[in-house]
Amino acid sequence: DMSRVELPMMFNLHHPLNLEVIGPEAQRDNMQSAAYRVIWGFLRKCPASKVRFCIFDPKEGGGSVRMLSNFVNKMPDSYKKAVTQMSRTEELLSCLKELEGQTLDFIRDRPDYDDLLDYNAHNPRRTEAITLLMLYDFPLNADARCLELLSSVMQKGNKCGIYVILCRNTAVEVASSYDHVDEKLAELEKNCVQIECKENGFALLPYHLSVRLIEKPDAGQLEKFAVEYHKAVEKLNVQSIHFEEILPPEPFQGSTAKVLKLPMGIGDGDSVVSMVFGEGTSHHGLIGGGTGGGKSTLLHTLIMSSMMN
């Protein structure tokens, strides 16, 4: 059909990604379906354990993301922490404050990097997860305080890997004692790519171009993917420290008269964990664990690291 042209629709995560899926109450299921596909796209494309979800679902208390809950239930306990579910205004407010602080910390502490993706590219053994903030039945339970913080996160959040998905239920009105809420909402939407839910599919606004989203996985595909994902996460959890990372530039020059840091292994966030000797620290430690738990290996690492430093 020469009268029809299909083009790929892709988002560049180096730029702000704020997606608003709009529809009336009658299209609520379709809006959830669209969000479902976005979640699936992120899980499928992002490295294992490198995407964090913050879900605000005031109407169903997590029921809107049952697919994600079922998926995470198959994951190790450590990965379940990567999904935060909220339903109350104060919970959303607290989450937004945390995300805004996270953004400001990144801008202050890592000025040499364009964004989190740039940081990850230059630090492959220290990669950090991106965050997908999803608000269902928006703007239900989101008062003016939330809208102000949300606007800040949407404008700066991509700097530290935060992306926002809004499921805008047009039947919901903002209930707030604050002034100019409608203006805040309109300003916020200017920073969004908008997709409208219709009975016959999805349309990209303001052009009303038809959009065909990726297909949802069936139960078998999701089960297979969850098993593979689980294996990938477990593999990531078993890491060792490279000798090059603990070798000091000038061996044998350390001194406990000041501060002596002895690299010991890999900790949370793939960061190097060190045992510190010197001013303000304790020179005593207790190593506990069952048979075969690695006590001797840890002592060997401590001895070798001490000798090299």
Report the location of each language-model feature.
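P-loop NTPase catalytic phosphate-binding loop
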Residues: 1-113, 119-226, 244-309
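Extended, compositionally biased alpha-helical segments that mediate assembly or anchoring
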Residues: 225-236
